[in-house]
């Protein structure tokens, strides 16, 4: 009993620390208010929204940090701190939306946790008319959540005690191999790369004549693979409004989404001129293969859907180069947006432009996600590759001998059975949550089967787009929104911390 109370004190202590840092971050949008004062919806309402939210966060954080002393955290305590910390940050991060937009707290909380988990599902429309500071805050929540809120907390207020345990709670972001000795050095390098790529994306988009504010917001949400946009039409806004360089913008964002979906240790190796990192491990090879295969299949299905392939085979009519380029651009953009779990859109994935095969593949991509150690969500490419290798191993054993001793080898290393069991358990937990979430959506809404399950696919995979429209998502019953909130958090923290949070045995 005493140990449980000590664990609770530690959880509240570190949550207080986290809220103090978040309180300072909540003051950053005031710069946007100052820049656009009197324009784009900026007024004393938005000033008060962020001042009050920041003050509340700082005060609660100060009280929790000082009222509950803590020396060290165990592994379970760190996982619980991770889950509670993300929930607490979302609770406070929702306040500017409530105060600035006068929306319900549930919708604001949904939007905040969608931001911090880099999911990108939204229950708001009218984005083009929203105050710029609110739009910036939405983008900033995704950037903070990209490499993990707790890793950001550690880099800002580094403490040796409990740091490794807390970092381990978000270890799905970073693989075991570190670019530099020492946890703080590793975090510093990774956040420097992250910030540098974000700055590069901002510059490239600004050079393409995208408005600077839009460039900043899209850079923040592209590298974090979050997908929030300051426009209702997402990236298609630029084509629809006749932007001269909308094609370049789409290709540029495709590239930066791809960077966000790659293990950041690969970026570090490339920046240190170790270019073999781009193909010398199994996960990155699977990554390139999936991108090429999915893009080709989606592109062919779109050409078939438009009737262009039929014209080629039946009448020998060649496909115009402009149509090929357009179809390729839409296909590769949407494949990258979903596979990296970013969720930007140049075309509604439920539209008639995409055929049945493409729509089914989008669901598969939602499950796979990006690479381990990236900002992407999903089950992760490495784990999919491991399950594929495991299936091949079992087939080999059945063919040769039931007693054949064949370990699972990946990149010249034998994978321990404990890791295989963990990946298999995580996979079945994913399936269970998808079934439960899809069932709840179908039961409490009027969505058809594909749309109902796509909502939970999107939430658990931290994707964003699904076959449910924003208007329908806004009207979802509270029970469905709460289910998606749990799904978004479970997907980002890879389920175990959330299961521990709701386990009575942990708190007895």
What are these regions (language model features)?
Residues 1-508:
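Membrane-proximal intracellular helices of multi-pass ion channels
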